[in-house]
């Protein structure tokens, strides 16, 4: 029961507060060659008026494979769970795990298709919104800036490197002067984490690396 409640809250945070548009479902069908030229076939509404396509995996900044604790909030509700995350320039994979390490849901993205499989969620949930948030944190900042600029939005990134070797990078998405989302990437000796705050949709979550 506990995990069912957590999944319902997670659904509210990442799916039900948003709507999306998939070009495959539009009246204009594209050939595979046209889709390659345009990039991802999935769009995400960052605001109620502006949508952006998902970037392709080749825009991933390096590669990462890690277990993370996900802690989040949506309104007055809070949740926490464990996840496994892998991403490189070919694909992205994410698995949601229970307290015993059992897979309770999985997401994958290879540039052509977003797949989300879980008995806990309806099949029509918008998994591309999870992909978009992950891209905002992990993908190349120049590629993100260009993508948002094409959608009429702005993307900023400021990285601070300390003498200790630790670093903090803050990424922000704006609609004109209105702050839509803020992503903080902390790479420290005691903590490696990503905090995502979406001011428009009213959700926040933090991903903290689990020590090996």
Residue ranges and their predicted role:
Residues 14-17:
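C-terminal motif of bacterial Sec signal peptides marking the signal peptidase cleavage site
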Residues 59-63, 85-90, 107-109, 187-189:
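Edge/loop elements at the starts and ends of beta-strands within beta-rich repeat scaffolds
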Residues 74-101:
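Structural recognition of beta-strand segments within beta-rich domains
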Residues 2-9:
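Sec-dependent signal peptide recognition
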Residues 52-74:
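A short, Trp-centered hydrophobic/proline-enriched beta-strand micro-motif
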Residues 19-51, 69, 102, 106, ...:
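Mature, soluble, non-transmembrane domains
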